């Protein structure tokens, strides 16, 4: 039972992740043979993007099950709580992490016996990964309807194949539109401080032969004013029940600018990223990362010694700034409080 994509490879014995910290200068890989190695890869952003984190955690759970296996089922379940906790404590904002781990834990409890349990859990993790690819392609098909031939789309961060198991959410929409024969151009903003737009989105799109122009973060408003942008499409790390969206820091700024210039602002996200238990964006925990991500660039210090740093990894975009949320079940328009719930009633 194997899986191989641009982002990850499951060999049956280990999880191999492309090291996204090294792209585009190098294509290196990290081999994870234990659940703690998977946890480290998530925490250190070897792998990033909510769906990719969720799938990686599921495979981490499988590796943990092999390490913790005992013949007594209840004792095994108890040991797996520790595995889940270690994986869950890596990054707090992306809800797919907790969704995937809860799904694995619930599947284990429902299975209810130790005979064949390791193979069962491996199959469940593979299902999570394969479903993610199918979901992303469905998001792409729905979202492509919103783009016209000749449109230029602004993206923020990386919500492509690298952020998922494959194909991508925001970039999946662009890929699908291009596959339909539409001539789509992309403006990718660099996305400081981790430069996911410059390093990852530009790299991905160039590999696919999609027309991409890189801009710095402070150019997006001017590009909009000049009429160079027809739509904005971003991904999401968590969507609250009222439609507020947590995504990579800088998303809120882009949404405000899009609103000012009358440009549609779309969020592409699977239903696994929608958290109906989170009422509003105020309830979403925002991860803060180390100060060196801001004070250093490419290993070179660019700020004074001992300067104070504020480095939230995410921000929250208010629902009223979002034109629509594109999911694998269709396009959701306001009022989000009502229409997001309908996705889970069908």
UniProtKB/Swiss-Prot annotation:
Pathway: Amino-acid biosynthesis; L-methionine biosynthesis via salvage pathway; L-methionine from S-methyl-5-thio-alpha-D-ribose 1-phosphate: step 1/6. The record marks 157 as: Transition state stabilizer. Gene3D superfamilies: translation initiation factor eif-2b, domain 1, Translation initiation factor eif-2b, domain 2. Its EC number is 5.3.1.23. Disulfide bonds: none annotated. The keyword Transmembrane helix does not apply. It catalyses: 5-(methylsulfanyl)-alpha-D-ribose 1-phosphate = 5-(methylsulfanyl)-D-ribulose 1-phosphate. Keywords: Amino-acid biosynthesis, Isomerase, Methionine biosynthesis. One of its GO terms (molecular function) is S-methyl-5-thioribose-1-phosphate isomerase activity. The active site is at residue 237. Catalyzes the interconversion of methylthioribose-1-phosphate (MTR-1-P) into methylthioribulose-1-phosphate (MTRu-1-P). PANTHER family: METHYLTHIORIBOSE-1-PHOSPHATE ISOMERASE. This is Methylthioribose-1-phosphate isomerase. The gene is mtnA.
């Amino acid at each position: 039972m194997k899986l191989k994509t641009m982002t990850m490879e499951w060999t049956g014995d280990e999880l191999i992740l492309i090291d996204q910290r090294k792209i585009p200068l190098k294509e290196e890989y990290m081999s994870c043979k234990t659940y703690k190695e998977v946890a480290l890869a998530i925490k250190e952003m070897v792998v990033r993007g909510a769906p990719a984190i969720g799938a990686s955690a599921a495979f981490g759970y499988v590796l943990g099950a092999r390490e913790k296996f005992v013949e007594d089922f209840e004792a095994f379940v108890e040991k797996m709580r520790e595995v889940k906790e270690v994986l869950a404590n890596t990054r707090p904002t992306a809800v797919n992490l907790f969704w995937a781990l809860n799904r694995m834990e619930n599947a284990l409890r429902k299975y209810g016996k130790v005979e064949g349990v390791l193979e069962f859990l491996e199959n469940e993790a593979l299902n999570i990964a394969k479903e993610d690819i199918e979901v992303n392609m469905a998001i792409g098909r729905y979202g492509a309807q919103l783009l016209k031939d000749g449109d230029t789309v602004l993206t923020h961060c990386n919500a492509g194949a690298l952020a998922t198991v494959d194909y991508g959410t925001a970039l999946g929409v662009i890929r699908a539109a291009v596959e339909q024969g539409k001539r789509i151009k992309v403006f990718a903003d660099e996305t400081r401080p981790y430069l996911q737009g410059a390093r990852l989105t530009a790299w991905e799109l160039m590999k696919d032969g999609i027309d991409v122009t890189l801009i710095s973060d402070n150019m997006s408003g001017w590009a909009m004013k000049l009429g160079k942008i027809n739509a904005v499409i971003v991904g999401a790390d968590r969507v609250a029940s009222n439609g507020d969206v947590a995504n990579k820091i800088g998303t809120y700024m882009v949404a405000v600018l899009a609103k000012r210039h009358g440009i549609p602002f779309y969020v592409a996200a699977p239903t696994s990223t929608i958290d109906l238990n989170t009422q509003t964006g105020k309830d979403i925990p925002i991860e803060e990362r180390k100060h060196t991500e801001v004070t250093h660039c490419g290993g070179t210090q660019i700020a004074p010694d001992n300067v104070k740093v504020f480095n939230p990894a995410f921000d929250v975009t208010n629902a009223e700034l979002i034109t629509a949320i594109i999911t694998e079940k269709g396009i959701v328009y306001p009022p989000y409080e009502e229409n997001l719930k309908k996705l889970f009633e069908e």
